[in-house]
UniProtKB/Swiss-Prot annotation:
This is Large ribosomal subunit protein uL4. One of its GO terms (cellular component) is ribosome. Part of the 50S ribosomal subunit. InterPro entries: Ribosomal_uL4 (IPR002136), Ribosomal_uL4-like (IPR013005), Ribosomal_uL4_dom_sf (IPR023574). The keyword RNA-binding applies. GO terms for biological process: translation. Residues 44-78 are annotated as: Disordered. One of the primary rRNA binding proteins, this protein initially binds near the 5'-end of the 23S rRNA. It is important during the early stages of 50S assembly. It makes multiple contacts with different domains of the 23S rRNA in the assembled 50S subunit and ribosome. Forms part of the polypeptide exit tunnel. The lineage of its organism: Bacteria, Pseudomonadati, Pseudomonadota, Betaproteobacteria, Burkholderiales. It holds the Pfam family Ribosomal_L4. Residues 58-70 have a biased composition (Basic residues). Belongs to the universal ribosomal protein uL4 family.
Length: 206
């Protein structure tokens, strides 16, 4: 698979040869869906909680006698049928949202995503991406010259200047190959990878 090479001015150079094992796989929509859903589920923190009828603070006194009032039977005001009563199936912080995906499936899913992005021409390669100073303006000018507005930058080592400059840009993220997740790969319109990072990705996913 040939990936397009960009220079600092956004002009295309000679293509970069990449491994077909990582960048030349068939598109597997079901596998990609499974990997992305598992990633989103595992990112959930489980920080919501509701009370059941044992936890709400109510008296246990019977609201009215069982018979003779003409009203429906009622045992206590903490009943889920009553306003202010407990929930029948309350959400709990102890809920486990995690999904398990085997390592081979996870790697195959990432390879399928990279391959489809390469076929769509959404992956570009640069020799390196560094900044002289941690200035957002400098990075914004570079991306504008390359025609990039929504971009995930994958670099072999995250330069401090590059990281600081990218934090204030919307729709821009900078990660190392080992932290490239399936959701980010799909979310961003373009993927910009350094040459050294391409080799690292191939090593991680081969």
């Amino acid at each position: 698979m040939e990936l397009k090479l960009l220079n600092a001015n956004g002009q295309e150079g000679a293509g970069v040869s990449a491994s077909d094992v990582v960048f030349g796989r068939d598109y597997n929509e079901a596998l990609i869906h499974q990997v992305v859903v598992a990633y989103q589920a595992n990112a959930r923190s489980g920080n919501r909680a509701q009370k059941d009828r044992e936890q709400v603070k109510h008296t246990t006194k019977k609201p009215w006698r069982q018979k003779g009032t003409g009203r429906a039977r009622a045992g206590m005001s903490s009943s889920p049928l009553w306003r202010g009563g407990g929930r029948i199936f309350p959400n709990s912080p102890e809920e486990n949202f995690s999904h398990k995906v085997n390592k081979k499936m996870h790697r195959a899913g990432l390879c399928s995503i990279f391959s489809q992005l390469a076929r769509e021409g959404r992956i570009s390669v640069v020799d390196e991406l560094t900044l002289e100073a941690p200035k957002t303006k400098l990075l914004a000018e570079k991306f504008k010259a390359m025609g990039l507005d929504s971009v995930l930058v994958i670099t072999d080592t995250v330069d401090e200047n590059l990281y600081l400059a990218s934090r204030n840009l919307a729709h821009v993220a900078v990660v190392e190959p080992r932290y490239a997740d399936p959701l980010s790969l799909i979310y961003f319109k373009k993927i910009l990878i350094t040459k050294a990072a391409v080799a690292q990705i191939e090593e991680l996913l081969s």
